[in-house]
Amino acid sequence: ITLNLHPADGVAAYEENYTEMAKDMGVDPETKKTIPWVNSDKKFIRSMFKNILGPMEKDGVDFWWLDWQQGMFDPKMKNLSNTWWINYAFFSDMEKRRETRPMLYHRWGGLGNHRYQVGFSGDAVISWKSLDFQPYFNSTASNVLYGYWSHDLGGHIGSQIDPEMYTRWLQFGALSPIMRTHSQKGAKLNKEPWVFNKEYCDIIRETIRQRYVMAPYIYTMARKGYDDGISLCRPMYYDYPENKEAYEFRNEYMFGDDVLVMPVTAPVENDYAQVRVWLPEGEWYEWHTGALLKGNQIVERSFAVDEYPIYIKAGAILPMYLDNVMNLNGNDEEVAVT
């Protein structure tokens, strides 16, 4: 469970335990004065964790989404980046007080900040152009060690959801480090599978199911990334630096050591999307058909809405859950090795 915070709003009088925090900060609670957020103030940060956030964590909040609306720098300490420091402060507090590994969801705070938060890339516009940019954005972030971007799959800002676009966005998200959806509040912006017609509902459910099934592989590669510093999602030139195609196919990426992905980021024409995929040396199995293809070639083929370009390196071993897995929390389900 996570809750969204807007820390820059400070601590207002209507918040639970405001009185205790106001006293800590030398503010008369009767004034109902909002206590401003100051990252560099140790007294403020300690009181906030003790009086405001700590009780909610005891009630079941696992981690915080810091939807920060701040200025760039702290008002009292020169050149202290608000984003960088709040990520550090929250992560360090969890590290000290909890027995579990810290988890934080927030924006990029600059070089070195990859140590702390899972990334929130901001309120994406609902458009094919936004979708087309994200695979490149996702993979190249590994160049600054930032392997955990997450996106508002399907877009956030707009008037309504395009079912095809949303489906393609989810397919990309299922083979990204973090898979989540989010949007503005609106009657035409709901993203639950059942709000779409049966065709799209079935495809969306199958896409989510694929993510569940691949969880053991994703976790294995995430752990390897933690140990080695090589991101789960990375550009092709990491593995094939001598090939010019590794730089030319900007949206193509490796998802772990053995899975090659080329997201579909444009609408279909006559029920199919035409996609060009570069297959590096070796042999590759096409996920949806099982066809074995030789590498060192560019493949162009049509993909229906329920298909997208995923290729598995021949000889790879992929640990996966069985197709009936329903819960990834504390899971001790059987694992199939493919």
Q: Where in this protein do the model-derived segments appear?
A:
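Catalytic-domain carbohydrate-binding cleft regions of carbohydrate-active enzymes
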Residues: 1-314
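Accessory, solvent-exposed terminal regions and/or long lumenal/extracellular loops of proteins
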Residues: 307-338
